[in-house]
UniProtKB/Swiss-Prot annotation:
Protein name listed in UniProt: Cytochrome b
Membrane topology: Multi-pass membrane protein
GO process annotations (BP): respiratory electron transport chain
Lineage: Bacteria, Pseudomonadati, Pseudomonadota, Alphaproteobacteria, Rickettsiales
The protein's role, per its UniProt record: Component of the ubiquinol-cytochrome c reductase complex (complex III or cytochrome b-c1 complex), which is a respiratory chain that generates an electrochemical potential coupled to ATP synthesis.
Binding site for heme b b562: 97, 198
Length: 400
């Protein structure tokens, strides 16, 4: 019997070698399993893998939902309700996709916060950081278009408000808005193109994630101490050590995910989106999804439409400049006492902006939003360069 098994194994190996010589997919997988990683990574380094799992879930559920969705203003709302009532486990698919978007953004926001704290944007990882911010921007575009598809009141008026922002561009703004709408108002052509782009953009995100991984593997992961790996004893193979650690993170992630799907599926949404879109009735309070609220607060903080648009886009663009705005040679905030305080003040400011973005556009929220928006830019444009110049960091360790 053992004589029968041995040739079969050899034949299998020969086939694998033949394929791998022409298409090195098995060598690629082997590289991942033997990839050397800093030995002191904490659970915060699980967030990249968790975001990857969230992206896969969004693509799978999105493709299946698209099979039952009708991108037409007369049928979109009803098709979503049909998915909820008549499609087998349609309610589960829709809630998984809707909650999954929030979970995806939560993982990415924590991933970005970890990068800010440990200086993962510093040399030689500038391009790694830039690709990550491009992924974040693409996610925002995808999520916005997806929010329009149910064609409820918030969907319609959210699309109207956000697309109208482009009208603030001098000379060509109105033409751009008409081009985006495919007509003179948000209507069927708008819904069709948003559906098409919402289907396309996740696959562009996958391509960007591949680039992100290539950039990551070029210089390896940063670590909590923020120092470079100096010897092989500072590293361990990614598998099995960090794959096991990732599975622990996945377990926690899916417990939280399942809680929202089965117990609070609409907690992060807005009840007005269960009302069919009506161009003649404006909601009392137009609110975007929670993950857009800090930027929405910055947009509303400025009376001028053009000024608000510039600040809103500037609040994201400033992240591209971060590798050069932070002048400190030390990466990790663990060894930067002043920056560590500034970081947590900045985190509190972002949470405050998120809260203010969900409040009505009235006093005192507008005034507080202006102060919070000012501090947001102060942190990047003033505090970081000055802290890096004058801060005295703690002594760095010699090894991990």
């Amino acid at each position: 019997m053992s004589d029968n098994i041995t040739p079969k194994t050899g034949k299998t190996n020969a086939i694998i070698e033949w394929i791998d010589y022409r298409l090195p997919v098995f060598s690629f997988l082997k590289h991942f399993s033997h990839y050397q990683t800093p030995k002191n990574l904490s659970y915060l380094w699980n967030l990249g893998s968790i975001a990857g799992i969230a992206l896969v879930i969004q693509i799978i559920t999105g493709v299946i939902l698209a099979m039952h969705y009708t991108p037409h203003v007369d049928h979109a709302f009803d098709s979503v309700e049909k998915i909820m009532r008549n499609v087998n486990y349609g309610w589960l698919l829709r809630y998984t996709h809707a909650v999954g978007a929030s979970m995806f953004f939560a993982a990415v926001y924590l991933h970005i916060a970890r990068g800010l704290y440990y200086g993962s944007y510093k040399a030689p990882r500038e391009l790694l950081w830039h690709i990550g911010i491009i992924i974040f921007l693409t996610m925002m575009a995808t999520a916005f278009m997806g929010y329009v598809l149910p064609w409820g009141q918030m969907s319609y008026w959210g699309a109207t408000v956000i697309t109208n922002l482009f009208s603030a561009i001098p000379l060509i703004g109105k033409s751009i808005v008409t081009w985006l709408w495919g007509g003179f108002s948000v209507d069927n052509p708008t819904l069709n193109r948003f559906f098409s782009l919402h289907y396309l953009l996740p696959f562009i995100i996958v391509a960007l994630v591949m680039l992100h991984l290539v950039a990551l593997h070029q210089h390896g992961s940063n670590n909590p101490k923020g120092i470079d790996v100096k010897s092989p004893k500072d590293t361990i193979p990614f598998h099995p050590y960090y794959t096991v650690k990732d599975f622990v993170g996945f377990g926690v992630y899916f417990i939280i995910f399942a809680y929202f799907i089965f117990y609070e599926p609409n907690y992060l949404g807005h009840p007005d989106n269960y009302i069919p879109a009506n161009p003649l009735v404006t909601p009392a309070h137009i609110v975007p999804e929670w993950y857009f609220l800090p930027f929405y607060a910055i947009l509303r903080a400025v009376p001028s439409k053009l000024g608000g648009v510039l600040l809103m886009f500037g609040s994201i663009f400033v992240l591209f400049l971060l590798p050069w705005l932070d002048t400190s040679k030390v990466r990790s905030a663990n060894y930067r006492p002043i920056y560590r305080i500034a970081f947590w003040i900045f985190m509190a400011d972002c949470l405050l902006l998120g809260y203010l973005g969900g409040q009505p556009a009235e006093e005192p929220y507008i005034t507080i939003s202006r102060f919070a928006a000012c501090y947001y830019f102060f942190h990047f444009l003033v505090a970081l360069p000055l802290i890096g110049k004058y801060e005295k960091p703690l002594p760095l360790p010699e090894e991990l």
